[in-house]
Amino acid sequence: VVDERIPFTIPVEGDNAVFTSMYDNFPDRIEIPVNERGRKVAVLAAASISLMQSRMDNGRLRVNLSDGTHRDVVLRDPETIDDWLGSGTGKPYVLAGHPVSLGKNAHGHLYEIDLGGDRMVKSVELETFTNETMIGLLGITVLQAEK
């Protein structure tokens, strides 16, 4: 995501995104090993959320640290995430957070999760809680401590 000065390397070929959902053909929770040290974790995500699922906790991003603690971001439409197509409007309607253009009237969300200092990141989890919701993890970057 060049505009935000946060590097995400997304492979052109092969699997480059993972989605969670309550639908039978998706996992409702995934955990991705990270095992890197940094001061923040930047996560690029996108969601498809039915309007009937707004104003409730749709999912959660969790950064697990090597000391057993974690940092959570609750994904709640429209407070911290919204539908990637803006529910047909083509415009983000999220109330907070940082929408990022994915091109052609689509958008995702950039989350910068502060770790409270230089910490070892064990993994990142994504979990979906509501029906008629798909949440995708498009990229993870650990931001190193400034030198």
Give names to the regions the model predicted.
Residues 1-147:
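N-terminal/edge-of-domain interface segments
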